[in-house]
Design a protein with these regions (language model features):
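Active-site-adjacent structural elements that line small-molecule/cofactor binding pockets in enzymes
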Residues: 1-318
Length: 318
């Protein structure tokens, strides 16, 4: 099992850099940046420029976005950003993509897309990225992203930086089955839960684990439908913590409860929010919060038995 952390791209930069150095010192296997722009009341850096800088603050962790929404970038531009960070980091880049949220269209001047069009775009973007991240030329005549790229820099990571797709519904799961190296979901909580005032659908840990298990069964079916061996597709979760579930960095027992709830699923990676999601939109963690986080991470991440590897798996051949 790998443990990673998701951080928001809120400055000042010096605090982010210090935090990422701490993540690595505490033994986290990866660190992710949430990728968005112009969120109301939320002064965020551009994620890939930020990752290029944070790559120089770290030496070991796999780094990337969780997720880069298909609503913000053309896939050729995103591929160039990923490969650039792969070189700057010495071969540690990964990229997560997903459908994102409808309001993101307006932030970059795009018309609103239907849910179906958004997921069709996700599938098309994933196919383009799957080729370009290998450094392959491409001539693609798709409906949304007609693309001709004659040359791409070869990545340091071979055969390519890992491509993660976050998906919950049938079309997204099929896109993951076709193109992804790793699938991700929101820890069994309702999609789009986020900082949502309506929390009536939030699930307990056993309920959330059961939902992840159901999604994994549907993912296996999607793999079968496209002729892919499901064992070649990694599985991961983002541990979204609703109010009815104690944050895993409240105590060692809370950490063990969350990890234990998903242990039977043989996940490849669990990603935790830090700071917690509710702090991303208000004041940062207090020194006491940070000290508790570091203490629990030291007990359960830094001091764990040596595992099979320290980074998110590179692509497996289907």
């Amino acid at each position: 099992m790998r443990y990673s952390v998701l951080n928001f791209s809120v400055g000042p930069y010096e605090r982010l850099a210090r935090r990422w150095r701490t993540f690595e010192e505490l033994g986290f296997d990866g660190a992710w940046i949430a990728d968005d722009l112009n969120v109301p009341g939320y002064a965020d850096f551009e994620s890939w420029a930020l990752l290029a800088a944070l790559a120089r603050e770290t030496t070991r962790m796999r780094i990337g976005t969780l997720i880069s929404t298909v609503r913000l970038r053309h896939p050729t531009f995103l591929a160039a950003q990923v490969v650039s960070v792969d070189h700057i980091s010495g071969g540690r880049a990964a990229v997560g993509i997903g459908a994102g949220e409808p309001e993101q269209n307006a932030r970059v001047g795009n018309p609103l897309w239907s849910a179906r069009e958004t997921l069709e775009r996700l599938d098309e973007q994933a196919g383009i990225l799957a080729a370009l991240l290998r450094g392959q030329p491409i001539a693609h005549d798709g409906p949304f992203y007609p693309t001709v790229v004659e040359a791409m820099p070869q990545p340091i990571t071979r055969p390519r930086p890992p491509l993660l797709i976050a998906a919950h519904g049938p079309m997204g799961l099929r896109a993951a089955a076709r193109h992804a190296d790793v699938w991700n979901c929101l820890g069994g909580q309702p999609y789009g839960a986020g900082p949502n005032p309506d929390r009536s659908a939030d699930r307990s840990l056993p309920e959330a684990a059961a939902e992840v298990e159901r999604l994994m069964a549907r993912l296996d079916e999607a793999c079968a439908a496209v002729g892919r061996d499901p064992t070649t597709l990694g599985r991961s979760i983002l541990a979204f913590i609703p109010e009815r579930v104690t944050d895993p960095f409240e105590s060692v027992d809370a950490f063990d409860a969350l990890v234990g709830a998903f242990a039977h699923l043989n996940l490849e990676e669990i990603t935790f929010y830090w700071p917690p999601l509710d702090m991303a939109f208000r004041e940062p963690p207090s020194p006491a919060d940070e000290a508790r986080f570091e203490r629990i991470a030291a007990h359960r991440i830094l001091d764990r038995p040596a595992g099979p590897g320290a980074t998110l798996a590179t692509p497996k051949e289907a």
